[in-house]
Amino acid sequence: MIKIITGRQSDPLQTEIIGRAARNYLAQPGKDTFIIVPNHIKFNTEVSAIGKVAQLQGREETSVKNLHVLSFSRLAWFFFKKADLLMPESLDDAAATMILEQIIDKRRDELLLFKNSHANSGMIKQVYSTILQVHTGQLDLGNLLERAADPAVALDLDNETRDKLHDLDLIYQDFLEIVSEKHFATKDELNIQLNQLLASRPDLVSQASFYVTDFSHFSIQEKMTMQLLAAFASEMTFAFKTADGSVIEPAAGEYDYVVQKTIKDLTGYFSAHDFAWEREKIASPASPARDLNQAWQGQGQPDLNNLQLVKADSRYAEAYFVARTIYDEVALKGCQYRDFLVLAPNLQEYETYLAPILRQNQIPFFDDLQQQMKYHPLVLLLENLGKLLQQAGDTPALLSIMKTRLLIPDWYLEGDAEAGEAAYLRDIDQLENFALAHGIKYSLWQKPLKDFTKAQVIALDQEQYQKWLDRLDKLRDFFVSKISRLARQLKSEKDSMTAVKLFFDFLVKNGVSARLEAWRLKASESGDLQQAQQPEQCWNLLLSLLKDYLLVNPENFAWADFFKMLTAAFSQANFATIPASLDAVTLSEYGMVQTSGYKQVFIIGAANGSLPQINDQPNFLTTENLASLADFFDQDAYLEDSQQLRNLDQEYQFGNALALASDRVYISYPVINSNNDLLDPSIYYKRLLKLVNGREYRQRDLPDIAEKDRTEFARQLLLFLTSPRASLGYLAYAEENSAQSPLVAKLVELSRQYEEEKAEEIAEGMAYDNNPQDISEDLAERLYGKDLLSSVSQLESYYQNSFEYFLNYGLRLRPRAENELNAIQSGNYFHRTFELLLKEMQKKNIEIDKLSELDLELLLKQVRSEILQEPLYQQFLRDPFNEYLFKVFDKTTSKVAQSYRRKQQENKMRATYGELAFGPAEKLAGLVLPLKKFAGQRKISLRGKIDRVDLFNGDQHVLGQLIDYKSSDHSFNLARFASGVDLQMIAYLDVLEKNRDLLAGGRQFDLLGAFYQYVTRKLNSVNSSSTGALFDSKLQLKENLLGGEDKLKLSGVFVSEPAWYQEVDKALEKKATSSVYRGLKLNKSGGFGKKDNFFSQDEMRELLEYVEALIEDAASEILSGQIALNPFRQGNNTGLAFSDYKDIFYFDQQLPTNSYRDLPNLKKADLLALVEKRLRQRE
């Protein structure tokens, strides 16, 4: 007898079916009773069925023998075992992909779509999916194409569909032939073989009863299984949920079209074959769930007190609302955790919110979101082995393999294995540091590490670390030699069996399987069953894939295809999940079938774009293709547009979700996503909001501290409270940000009684101040020494942000060295080029203005060749791109040098010193300043290098100027100098002044200025609106701007003595504008006029004194242990812009204790007034 039971979505059909099956089992215990359900709910349904049997028996517990709760796949295996039928080896998706790639390559000339195009992995996957549909649908593509080509048939296909079918037919026939030859079974073969078995062996089910529930649609083969069971089984009962429990003629677009069509297909088959069947509509009891279901379908508008809509500030607020509600319901109303179900359209979006918050509130939960295998260490090992075979010495791949901890050398594990593993990981970190610092990649991994130490770029390069370096070299050789040997073996091997054996032996002999087993045992002993099964599942899948590969490709081994198959298979694989507890909250994805019996259901993430779940993923045969094929299908052979069916079923599926709760449904959405983008509610949410007349709860991230009414504030605060541990943060926030409240104080006191240590941590966190504390003078002396030896750039960093100075030069923290040709290294290359150029000219007693353009280039070529032989630059040249960059740099230095050569023909200043070092033990004395704060008992010594010093020996005096090379355009900024952020130019002038006798040989020495030399190849724009445009307003060419020559003029700080510049700059004899100095122009009276960067000799002397005061102040504060998080800010430039220590600072301008030190805009008069004031204080 066949029964079709129907009811509303809110009716307990699943419970009804389980009850009938249990009673049937008890009435006929010797016969098989089957409950067929979707795989996702098999476990929970089995628990419910056994529980129902126990209830009917009047027991608390029971066992069953012939009551089976199965999915379709498990049903197939059940009967295969019963019939002693062995199924062929199941074909993995990765193996199927490999077969299809081989077919397409072989058939390429015959194919239409793939003839001239590459079939990528995504397209292959679509083709395979369509092949499975064709196979399941029993469709004869060749016959279909013949019918479409027959003029007598009044049907036709468009060109796209015909071409796709043509290619699909060729590929499909070859695929089936290969699968048959290899004795494989495709993943849809289970149902096909099951149906063949049932058709040939009706005795297997003739005494059995079947109960089918929680399906709204069957695939073609599943439908055939139902038809066969209906024909041969002793009893067959179906349960379907329709709009109102009635069965009507299906019409596309109707609410329950899909399930009605399923019922129609079944009953039509029953009637056509004269099967006796009856329909039963169960009573639909009044309930809140039925009211909500009716309202959702537009059947009346009852009072929906069981529906709560929630608008949340964020996903965190959504997750906290779920946890707080569950906590309250369990703690105050006697609910159990298994009464709650949480659904999300994309559960992965909430993975980092829900799980931690539920754990914090000690709420047990089962997350049925499957974990992907592709991040497991074994999978990373396999994937990176493939990369190393493709590109030997791929540094990221090699380091990734080391970090998997699957190939640890034996010498680390002798003795204490845990300590040995820790030592191994430390050595891997140091080896990575060394490799990155020296640019070790590809074939360089074959070299001993000592070959790289000449560059001296990392501490391990120093002789004192030789033993450590030897240990790292031993580790390097271990991995490189083993992997290189494996690569050679696999690349040279042509026999698949031998190659796979070599690969498998490599894993086993190097301890990979043993490590996996050790991880499994450790996780099992700690009670983490989910973690314990992962190593075993990964290893078993690998074994299965190796077997598949040998079946698909037993002869001609291709290592690239082998690793491609492994990577593809693991990228799609998931770990099986284990329910953590029978009493736990269930977290699941919306759209998956769920068991009944939940009291409260949360549907989170109900934002526009998430609900409804419209599926528009590309398929090989599109919806349009399938529509044009529809006329060629019949009831026993067809292809379903599963995507269209899912889209048509969206409202029905949402109705199913609403009907899962017997008591209450919560639907929420966040107003922003994790990127802070605004989100709109789903159209479903808006529709329900109208049904409840706009009744909506607002879940905030935090209690509203702006609430003045104490009673209302207390009510809001209580809505955030759960366990003492989880509530402490909210209570601390309320205590700090609200007026004195006896309630808050009492709640804080109560929480402290349970979580005293946590309360202290939160109190400290609430009072946390990221500003550093000063250190003692004694500790400062231990860090810096009694006297301070420093450079100008170091002191500038102190004024930019003194905390950074402490981290860099006190604690000596450094970012990890990397072998990259960055802005600093390019600047060093420019400096080195000009330094050696000057030395070479002095060595040969050559004046640059006497050289021809060609001679200068030859000299530069000689200098560059010398530089690139240095160990550091040899290291950079290992990267071909760096070789290109050096050529670009050389063009820049050539332009600057040639410009300098031309200008020297009109300038009498001569480059005398390059990279002139000053300081202790140098020929040129540095600044040595006693510190008044320490009564002169301590001092600062300034050291450094001046890029270039130019001198002019005149009749009356010697003039000196310093040149500083810059890779970006610079000017002398008064505010930055006044604040100490830019000390360099004036401090270096002070050094020259202090060494006047050495520089001038006892003659009168005068400072001309300090200037920036912009090292650039930039040109001026043709159509710029700025003064740098090549054409003026009358479209006249500005010849002085051609070639960007104006950018190469010297700019900086000038001593305002016109006669001195006329003495050295020949151009000023003919015209008022200098060709050497930017911004230098004589007025009619022969002066310079008022300019902020021009200073008289007396003013310059004051600046020199002032810079000494700044240096003395910085040194005194450093040696006193003063530290502050005080970054400067000037416009868009800040002391944090290029900092390597931002993750330490945690600087946040929104915090009341964090603020920038804003530099004022200063004119020359303002600067001089400030200087005079400071000098008076110094006296």
From Swiss-Prot:
- Any keyword Aminoacyl-tRNA synthetase? no
* InterPro entries, A to Z: ADDB_N (IPR049035), DNA_helicase_suRexB (IPR014141), P-loop_NTPase (IPR027417), PDDEXK_AddAB-type (IPR038726), Restrct_endonuc-II-like (IPR011335)
Matching entries from Gene3D superfamilies are given as: P-loop containing nucleotide triphosphate hydrolases (3.40.50.300)
Q: Which of the seven top EC classes does this enzyme belong to? A: hydrolase
Cofactors that this protein relies on: Mg(2+)
EC number per UniProt? 3.1.-.-
Please give the coiled-coil regions recorded for this protein.
none
What keyword terms does UniProt attach to this protein? ATP-binding, DNA damage, DNA repair, DNA-binding, Exonuclease, Helicase, Hydrolase, Nuclease, Nucleotide-binding
One GO biological process term: double-strand break repair via homologous recombination
- Top-level taxon in the UniProt lineage: Bacteria
The protein's GO terms of the molecular function aspect are: 5'-3' exonuclease activity; ATP binding; double-stranded DNA binding; helicase activity; hydrolase activity, acting on acid anhydrides
Summarize subunit and interaction data from the UniProt record for this chain: Heterodimer of AddA and RexB.
* PANTHER family, sorted: RECBCD ENZYME SUBUNIT RECC (PTHR30591:SF1)
> Further remark, if any?
Despite having helicase-like domains, this subunit does not have helicase activity.
The text of the family note is:
Belongs to the helicase family. AddB/RexB type 2 subfamily.
Instruction: Say what the protein does.
Output: The heterodimer acts as both an ATP-dependent DNA helicase and an ATP-dependent, dual-direction single-stranded exonuclease. Recognizes the chi site generating a DNA molecule suitable for the initiation of homologous recombination. This subunit has 5' -> 3' nuclease activity but not helicase activity.
Return the protein name: ATP-dependent helicase/deoxyribonuclease subunit B
Q: Which organism is it from?
A: Lactobacillus delbrueckii subsp. bulgaricus (strain ATCC BAA-365 / Lb-18)
State the encoding gene. Answer: rexB
